[in-house]
Regions:
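Juxtamembrane membrane-interface segments at transmembrane alpha-helix termini
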Residues: 54, 71-72, 124-125, 173-180, ...
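Specific aromatic-rich, kink-prone transmembrane helix
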Residues: 58-61, 145, 193-200, 244-249
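Alpha-helical transmembrane segments of multi-pass integral membrane proteins
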Residues: 101, 192, 221-324
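Membrane-interface helix caps and helix-loop-helix hairpins in membrane proteins
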Residues: 105-107, 126-131, 174-183, 225-235
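Short, aromatic-rich membrane-interface segments at the entry and exit
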Residues: 110-111, 158-163, 181-188, 231-240
Length: 341
């Protein structure tokens, strides 16, 4: 993994704000609240595209942790994929089981099986409803499968730029010819490649942002405004994600909006929150709490806060529970080995 000196603390804050935005968007979209204005008609709905930011951060983060190990053959194929499954599968399996209990059906059982393999991202147009937001996980796991090939693609800067251009063209073809959207790894590849490119230039970019943080902030503001002025497109979203990730590289000192204990905590469990927040929403829905205060702003705020807080509590408790089980199983295996010696 990257060393302490190479750790980019601001990324946790970036992930924290991204997951809050996505949760706000899903609550608004599913609750069908009768509220209007720019914030509720354009700003919050646009947060759906923050999933692409997660993909870019995944590309960058995986490179920080494993690029040199893969290139220098310091990690075996078995160890690499084992770590991916061990990190994701237990928590995701628990969520799938809960989702099935909440809404049991034959179709859900089929989808749970697909989810538990973590290979659902290989299915064409799967449209899985069990943990529906996990399509992002499905795409990211396909990226994990292809990561050794990805390391080859960004093996040098010249090749990486060529691959980035090809990925951008492929993204356009997916939209305009092949009719494949964001649930397809080929469509999303440009975001992972962009994360890899930023990794290749990470030292220069971090130094630039540290020296000229105001300029980097202005660039981020400009691309954010452009996103709304020019409309949502791969180019505008890609520009925003790149500017946001680059800006965070220079945020290493505490006290800011990106580097603080709360942001670090939420960023550390951001993907767990992402996967569970709609399960929490469905529970609130079944308890008839989504419209407890009517259909207006107060009801939306209450539901959004309840979903976010509930997701945080669930994520922390679930991780604690799964860690206890893991520790118990390891101790049991170790005791058996001792007894056999």
């Amino acid at each position: 993994m990257d060393t302490k000196a190479d750790r980019y603390e601001g990324i946790d804050g970036l992930k924290a704000y991204a997951i809050i935005g996505i949760a706000l968007m899903h609550v608004l979209a599913n609750g069908e609240y009768g509220i209007g204005g720019f914030v509720f008609e354009r700003l919050i709905p646009s947060f759906t595209n923050l999933v692409f930011l997660f993909m870019m951060v995944s590309g960058f983060g995986m490179c920080c942790g494993y690029y040199q190990k893969i290139v220098n053959q310091k990690i075996s194929v078995e160890d690499f994929y084992k770590k991916r499954y061990i990190k994701i599968w237990p928590y995701f399996a628990l969520l799938c089981a809960l989702d099935f209990v909440i809404s049991p059906s034959k179709e859900s059982l089929f989808e749970v099986f697909a989810n538990l393999t973590l290979c659902q991202g290989l299915l064409p147009n799967a449209k899985i409803s069990v943990i529906g937001v996990s399509w992002t996980l499905a795409v990211i796991f396909v990226f994990y499968m292809l990561f050794p090939f990805f390391c080859f693609l960004i093996g040098n800067k010249k090749r990486a730029w060529g691959v980035a251009v090809a990925a951008l063209v492929f993204n356009w073809l997916c939209s305009n010819y092949f009719n494949d959207g964001r649930t397809n790894i080929v469509y999303d590849a440009v975001y992972f490649i962009a994360g890899g490119l930023i990794f290749l230039y990470r030292k220069e970019l971090a130094e630039f942002v540290s020296k000229y943080k105001v300029i980097a902030g202005v660039i981020l503001l400009v691309v954010s405004v452009t996103y709304f002025a020019a409309g949502s497109s791969t180019f505008t979203m890609l520009s925003f994600c790149v500017a946001a990730l680059i800006y965070t590289l220079g945020c290493r000192t505490g006290g800011g909006v990106l580097v603080n204990p709360v942001a670090k905590f939420l960023g550390g469990i951001s993907f767990e929150i992402y996967l569970c927040h709609m399960v929490i929403y469905r529970v609130l829905e079944k308890l008839h709490l989504v419209h407890l205060f009517g259909n207006g702003l107060l009801a939306y705020i209450f539901t959004a806060v309840a979903v976010i807080c509930g997701s945080v509590v669930f994520s922390v408790c679930a991780k604690w529970f799964l860690n206890k089980i893991e520790t118990f199983l390891k101790e049991k295996v170790n005791n058996r080995r001792v007894n056999h010696v």
